[in-house]
Each structure stands twice: as structure tokens, then as C-alpha cells.
């Protein structure tokens, strides 16, 4: 009988004790969660929890609105 394949659960990078805070002014952090085309990368790829993904999306949208991040990258 073959063993079942168990995928290792990824942990959220923002749930650790010394994890960085999600802030719209931290452009370097936010750029890691935006694709090269300027789209927000989904949480199934980045392993961010649902709550933190919502906070991250809101921070990216804020940074775009005030001009810290571009809406699209050519």
C-alpha cells in the first residue's frame, strides 16, 4: 500500500513573533507581494493567512493611491 502524500503546511510570514508589520509606507516589503506586472500575488502562492492577505492588499492599494507603488509596471 502506498503512503499518502502530505503537503507540508506553509506558515504565514506575518504571524511570527518578530515578523514585520504590514505598513503602506514600507514599499520594500510590499514589493515582495506584487508581481512583476504590478498585480497582488495570491495568498496560495505567498502562504499569507487570509487576515494578513486582506491587510496586505489594503496596504498595497493605499501605497498605490498616494503614489508610493505603481499601479502597473511596463
Swiss-Prot record:
Known partners and oligomeric status: Part of the 30S ribosomal subunit. Forms a tight heterodimer with protein bS6.
Gene name of this polypeptide: rpsR
SUPFAM superfamilies listed in its UniProt record: Ribosomal protein S18
Keyword Ribosomal protein among UniProt keywords: yes
GO cellular component labels: cytosolic small ribosomal subunit
Disulfide bridge map: none
Function summary: Binds as a heterodimer with protein bS6 to the central domain of the 16S rRNA, where it helps stabilize the platform of the 30S subunit.
This protein's name: Small ribosomal subunit protein bS18
GO BP of this protein: translation
Family as reported in the entry's similarity comment: Belongs to the bacterial ribosomal protein bS18 family.
GO molecular-function term, one example from the UniProt record: structural constituent of ribosome
Organism domain of life: Bacteria
InterPro entries documented for this protein: Ribosomal_bS18 (IPR001648), Ribosomal_bS18_CS (IPR018275), Ribosomal_bS18_sf (IPR036870)
Record key words, sorted: Ribonucleoprotein, Ribosomal protein, RNA-binding, rRNA-binding
Keyword Ribosomal protein: yes
Amino acid at each position: 500500500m502506498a503512503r499518502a502524500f502530505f503537503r507540508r503546511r506553509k506558515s504565514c510570514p506575518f504571524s511570527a513573533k518578530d515578523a514585520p508589520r504590514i505598513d503602506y509606507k514600507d514599499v520594500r516589503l510590499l514589493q515582495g507581494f506584487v508581481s512583476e506586472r504590478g498585480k497582488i500575488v495570491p495568498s496560495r502562492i505567498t502562504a499569507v493567512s487570509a487576515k494578513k492577505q486582506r491587510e496586505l492588499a489594503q496596504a498595497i492599494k493605499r501605497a498605490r493611491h498616494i503614489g508610493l507603488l505603481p499601479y502597473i509596471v511596463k
